[in-house]
UniProtKB/Swiss-Prot annotation:
This is Isoleucine--tRNA ligase. The gene is ileS. A motif ('KMSKS' region) lies at residues 595-599. Transmembrane segments: none annotated. ATP binds at K598. GO terms for cellular component: cytosol. GO terms for biological process: isoleucyl-tRNA aminoacylation. Monomer. It catalyses: tRNA(Ile) + L-isoleucine + ATP = L-isoleucyl-tRNA(Ile) + AMP + diphosphate. Zn(2+) binds at C885, C888, C905, C908. It comes from the Bacteria. Belongs to the class-I aminoacyl-tRNA synthetase family. IleS type 1 subfamily.
Length: 916
């Protein structure tokens, strides 16, 4: 008789190979057809909500792995919260205004000079919407679930209107003002930039020491003395109006070979070295404090202009001479200190960074080219003491990667000073996963300057400001709200399509416009004001959402970006942060921790991962990272991830195959009647569930990744599933022992599938559709397993048994190497007490030891001859006695000898009798 036909072998249609690139789109189509996002919301309607507010990615270009990391973690969070019973809507968003889209159109050959502003803006809008569709498709392919049919988009009329109203509220509170201040200016973009749009790169610059003759000594210094300043921006010397010294620092007048120089005493050695002075030739003639030098007058080296000596606390002794070249038109500190002394603000550059007529002999020169002309002129005037070149970290435009300058221009500002303390207080009220996140945003708010919110571009939300005939600014509640209403009805393009008077309320008058003539502001708002208004435009405007959000989660660059602009506008208008909890992730690097770049050939993109391996591999990779810091990806890392995935899949498949004839409605064994080993596994499952839920709650996905592997490898593969084959395949179908194990296997399968569902969204769904008798149509509409108290005494007992079992396995391995046995079923294990452990007494508590050890025979006695000493007893491995049963392959001395039951052990004889 062929006994193979009498075995209850695993049966399942669940394929061994994932085939994810082909399978996943089919699963996603089903979700779409079944309207799963809405069903998930409906299921938890009326429950406590959990709002993760999506920081809008920029609507330009293909997705990179940073996008994938961000969106996948957000999806894991929202799916988990949904399965925990929260009403957790997810509204994805896109940021659509700004220079990159203007540049993209220019690259495509669109000439904005050949069309009206409104026409060009319409093309920008079309381009942005096309980009959104491409990115949307790619996000959905990653398995991200959300309201992609109705995302929030910063160019939508209702969003722009909300932004204008928020602006109006800030204006009402006196937080919006116009001023001429030095701001970061990008000649390459021809626009001002906010701090968030600046990045630092190394730049080679001229480093010069310049002498300024004393003009009026004020009775403090000698008439023939000179102040020495140091600068790395020679082109700003034409704008110099002052020399700043620190009031509390000690300064000295030094005689060097007959020349008299004034510098800070603390820097005298550094200056002497830089200017190659002979140390023996240096004499300190006079000493004074910076306060005593205040109002001394110096002469500009080549212009007929006084350079006033003033006091400023920003002067340090870190570098230079302690006498700081001061040009209020080209530096924030210079501007602030200059205001105290009513100094002129000179900034003789145009939008392209070229000197204007005000620049005199430098007119028409690009500022960087003027460096040489200025140093040549200083040499000619005998004012240049030293010229070197240094490489230093310098601010660059984050879009064009070109250097920026400080340039004083009329700009619109949002006041940070007036709300700074309120924002800092709101940060104190916000929860963070890591302390450094709090410190980072706190310090940025504490140290940041006023926020330049105007941009000299056309693709953006216009500033709702009008001017009267006499130049008065018109920015009232009435006018701003009227503009908001117009934008809501027509979109912001109406600003560029209508005259100013047609954008004002009907019949509007102003004393500054006796003729009824008005003009409008042509600057647009900083894109950070756009996205920073999303709490108003989205959280407060959409019925399914609410303010403040439970979570903002973005890349760590957003501490100075979206996190920063959002809390600024929210505190300014609502008096609180827009988020209760702030979480960030690092950047994605290559396998060696290097930045990805085409030139290095180390770029991996989401599209490639999804097409070659599947979205679930990308998602599993995300869960395997310590995302709070920078993370790594490479082909090798993805291969390792695929191996882990394969192990998970095969384990789930094995369990599916072995519950194919199990019906939980009729076959389940009550917990009290389960075999103790099955109760042990049930409690290990509960332990695993509790820690996994805790890790989800704490956003610790790496811990989940590690614990899943540990549970699968240690508890299931290395023990329970291996041990179980002798029961699941061999025992009679309805045997108590078999149904007991199936009861627990079914529970493990269902609970593990749920616990994996937020991460392996497609695979969990595929397992669910192959799991018999599940009630929900989708695992994503099921609830997470409940955390149940474990039987700790039972776990302690079995944990000790598992440690003893490890010793038995070590002994079996030795016996295998010594050719005593081949397979473990050829073994007889003899165990006894030793000084370490009373194994005989301990093992009396357990039944079916031969099955638990996966051997044919076990003998337990107080003492064992010729045994090896192990931590948990003395162990000897013999070859099993008797003959091998042809059905279960266990060795026995009681093989059947007649007819159908020949060569079977007593157990198999009983089972086969029921089948014959």
């Amino acid at each position: 008789m062929n006994y193979k036909d009498t075995l209850l072998m695993p049966k399942t249609d669940f394929p061994m190979r994932g085939g994810l690139p082909n399978k996943e789109p089919q699963i996603q189509e089903q979700w779409e057809a079944n309207n799963q996002y809405q069903k998930a919301l409906e299921k938890n309607k009326g429950n406590q909500s959990y709002i993760l507010h999506d920081g809008p990615p920029y609507a330009n270009g293909n997705l990179h792995m940073g996008h994938a990391l961000n969106k996948i973690i957000k999806d894991i969070i929202v799916r988990y919260k949904t399965m925990q019973g929260f009403y957790a809507p997810y509204v994805p968003g896109w940021d659509t205004h700004g220079l990159p889209i203007e540049q993209a159109l220019t690259k495509k050959g669109v000439d904005r000079k050949k069309m009206s502003i409104a026409e060009f803006r319409e093309k920008c809008k079309e381009f942005a919407l096309e980009q959104i569709e491409l990115q949307k498709k790619d996000f959905k392919r990653l398995g991200v679930r959300g309201d992609f049919n109705d995302p929030y988009i910063t160019l939508k009329p209702e969003y722009e209107a909300a932004q204008i109203r928020l602006f109006g509220e800030m204006a009402d509170k006196g937080l919006i003002y116009k001023g001429k201040k030095p701001v970061y200016w990008s000649p390459s973009s021809e626009s001002s930039l906010a701090e968030a749009e600046i990045e630092y790169h190394d730049k080679r610059s001229a480093s010069i020491y310049v002498a300024f003759d004393v003009k009026d000594t004020k009775g403090v210094v000698d008439q023939d003395a000179q102040f020495i300043i140091w600068t790395t921006t020679p082109w700003t010397i034409p704008s110099n109006v002052a020399i700043t010294v620190h009031p509390d620092l000690k300064y000295g007048q030094y005689n060097v070979n007959g020349k008299k120089y004034i510098i800070a005493q603390a820097l005298s050695e550094d200056v002497a070295e830089a200017l190659e002075w002979d140390k023996d030739a240096i004499q300190l003639e006079k000493e004074f404090t910076g306060k005593e030098l205040e109002y001394v007058e110096a002469q500009h080296p080549f212009l007929d202009r006084i350079s006033l000596v003033i006091n400023g606390n920003h002067v340090t002794t870190d570098a230079g001479t302690g006498c700081v070249h001061t040009a209020p038109g080209h530096g924030e500190d210079d501007y602030i200190v200059g205001q105290k002394y009513d100094l002129p603000v000179i900034s003789p550059l145009d939008d392209k960074g070229v000197f204007t007529e005000e620049g005199g002999q430098f007119e028409g020169m690009f500022y960087d080219k003027a460096n040489k002309a200025v140093t040549d002129l200083l040499t000619e005037k005998d004012a240049l003491l030293k010229l070197n070149f240094i490489t230093h970290s310098y601010p660059h435009d984050w879009r064009t990667k070109k250097p920026v300058i400080f340039r004083a221009t009329p700009q619109w500002f949002a006041s940070i000073n007036k709300v700074r303390q309120d924002i800092l207080d709101a940060i104190e009220e916000t929860d963070f996963k890591v302390d450094w996140g709090k410190t980072r945003i706190y310090n940025m708010i504490r140290d940041r300057g006023e926020w330049v919110i105007s941009r000299q571009r056309v693709w953006g939300v216009p500033l709702p400001v009008f001017y009267a005939e006499n130049g008065d600014i018109i920015m009232t509640k009435e006018t701003v709200n009227h503009v908001a209403d117009l934008f809501e009805e027509h979109g912001s393009n109406i600003w560029f399509e209508r005259e100013a008077k047609d954008l004002l309320p009907e019949g509007f008058t102003h004393p500054g416009s006796p003729n009824g003539t008005f003009t409008k502001e042509m600057d647009i708002m900083d894109v950070w004001f756009d996205s920073g208004s999303s709490h108003r435009g989205v959280l407060e405007n959409r019925p399914e959402l609410s303010f403040p959000a439970d979570l903002y989660f973005e890349g760590s660059d957003q501490y100075r970006g979206w996190f920063n602009s959002s809390i600024t506008t929210a505190v300014a208008t609502r008096g609180q942060a827009p988020y209760k909890f702030l979480l960030s992730h690092g950047f994605v690097m290559d396998g060696e921790g290097k930045k990805m770049s085409k030139s290095l050939g180390n770029v991996i993109v989401p599209d490639q991962v999804v097409k070659q391996k599947g979205a679930d591999i990308a998602r599993l990779w995300v869960s395997s990272t310590d995302y709070l810091a920078d993370v790594r990806i490479s082909d090798e890392i993805l291969k390792q991830t695929s191996d882990v995935y394969r192990k998970i899949r095969n384990t789930l498949r094995f369990m599916l195959g072995n519950i194919n004839d199990f019906n939980p409605d009729t076959d389940v064994i009550p917990e009290a009647e389960l075999l103790e080993v099955d109760r042990y596994l049930l409690n290990r499952l509960r332990e695993f569930t509790a820690s996994t839920i805790e890790h989800y709650d704490n956003f610790d996905y790496l811990n989940i990744y590690q614990e899943v592997q540990n549970f699968i490898n240690v508890e299931l593969s290395n023990f329970y599933l291996d041990y179980g084959k002798d029961i699941l395949y061999i025992e009679e179908k309805n045997a108590h022992k078999r149904r007991s194990m199936q009861t627990v296997l079914y529970q493990i399968l269902v609970d593990m599938t749920k616990l994996l569902a937020p991460i392996l969204v497609h695979t969990a769904e595929e397992v669910w559709t192959h799991t018999p008798h599940v009630k929900e149509e989708s695992v994503h509409l099921a609830d997470m397993p409940k955390v149940v108290e474990v039987d700790q005494a039972l776990l302690d007992k079995w944990n000790q048994f598992m440690a003893l079992r490890d010793d038995v396995n070590r002994a079996l391995e030795v016996a295998r190497n010594n050719k005593v046995i081949g397979k473990s079923l050829e073994a007889k294990v003899v165990i006894g007490n030793n000084d370490n452990f009373k194994a005989a007494e301990f093992l009396q508590q357990f039944e079916d030891l031969q099955q638990l050890f996966i051997v044919s025979q076990v003998e337990v006695s107080d003492s064992v001859d010729n045994a090896e000493a192990y931590q948990h007893g003395d162990i000897r491995i013999d070859h099993a006695v008797g003959e091998k049963c042809e059905r279960c392959w266990n060795y026995t001395e009681e093989l059947g000898s007649v007819g159908e039951l020949e060569h079977l052990c007593p157990r198999c004889q009983e089972v086969v009798k029921t089948l014959v």
